């Protein structure tokens, strides 16, 4: 099947990069993700990525342990750059041209985030990985994904996680939890569903950017989502709740 979208933003959780490890980065998992992303690029789809840092450091946990919240968030932003560089290396080993742009200047290892330059890279067929979050504390990488998607005019956000969609309750603690096939932004917000944080969902709603939540643990899911195959959960303004 041919791709349904021309330009996409993929949100990868940091935890997904751990694989079965308790901490850090599993190189085999990164290589697997890179292979799937390469397939998307080879299909001619312009691909941007926002990666989290929770496999290395999570600002909220640091703050809960007594750290200054802003300081903890900045450390978390640096963790996302480590993940971005790791993914860049894996992609370039597969001959996929990739650029890392960071919201905090790190000129020795990455370009600064410049919207027009990012779009130009995408138009030239390069993958762009956005690191360091939005550059501001108190904002999640989910919100960064929504922000960058709006800025680069992405048609959809793919949120690839360890869960196969959005449920009406935590499936780990509620065996009878029901997975949604589709739902609206408003329903996700009013019922506090675990799609993204509320700021990110509101930003997607305001800019009419659909979100597809699916599991990365099934090989080929990124491409399936790209072709419009019904996997995971679709969140959008005109979606039926089902």
UniProtKB/Swiss-Prot annotation:
It comes from the Bacteria. GO terms for biological process: 'de novo' CTP biosynthetic process; UDP biosynthetic process. Its EC number is 2.7.4.22. Pathway: Pyrimidine metabolism; CTP biosynthesis via de novo pathway; UDP from UMP (UMPK route): step 1/1. Inhibited by UTP. The keyword Nucleus does not apply. Keywords: ATP-binding, Cytoplasm, Kinase, Nucleotide-binding, Pyrimidine biosynthesis, Transferase. Catalyzes the reversible phosphorylation of UMP to UDP. This is Uridylate kinase. It comes from Thermosynechococcus vestitus (strain NIES-2133 / IAM M-273 / BP-1).
């Amino acid at each position: 099947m041919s791709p349904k979208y021309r330009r996409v933003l993929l949100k990868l959780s940091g935890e997904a990069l751990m694989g079965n490890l308790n901490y850090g980065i599993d190189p085999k998992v990164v290589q697997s993700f890179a292979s799937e992303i390469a397939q998307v690029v080879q299909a001619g789809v312009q691909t941007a990525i926002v990666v989290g840092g929770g496999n290395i450091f999570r600002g909220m946990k640091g703050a809960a342990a007594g750290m200054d919240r802003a300081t903890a968030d900045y450390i978390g932003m640096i963790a996302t750059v480590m993940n971005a560089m790791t993914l860049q290396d894996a992609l370039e080993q597969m001959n996929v041209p990739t650029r890392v742009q960071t919201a905090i200047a790190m000129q020795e290892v990455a370009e600064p985030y410049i919207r027009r330059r990012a779009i130009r890279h995408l138009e030239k067929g390069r993958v762009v990985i956005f690191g360091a979050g939005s550059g501001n504390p108190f904002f999640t990488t989910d919100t960064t994904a929504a922000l960058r998607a709006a800025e680069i005019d992405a048609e959809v956000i793919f949120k690839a996680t360890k869960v196969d969609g959005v449920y009406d309750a935590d499936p780990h603690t509620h065996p009878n939890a029901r997975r949604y096939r589709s739902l609206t932004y408003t329903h996700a917000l009013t019922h506090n569903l675990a799609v993204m944080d509320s700021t990110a969902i509101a930003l997607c709603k305001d800019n009419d950017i659909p979100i597809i939540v699916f599991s990365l643990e099934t090989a080929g899911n990124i491409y399936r989502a790209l072709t419009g195959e019904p996997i995971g959960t679709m969140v959008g303004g005109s979606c039926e709740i089902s």
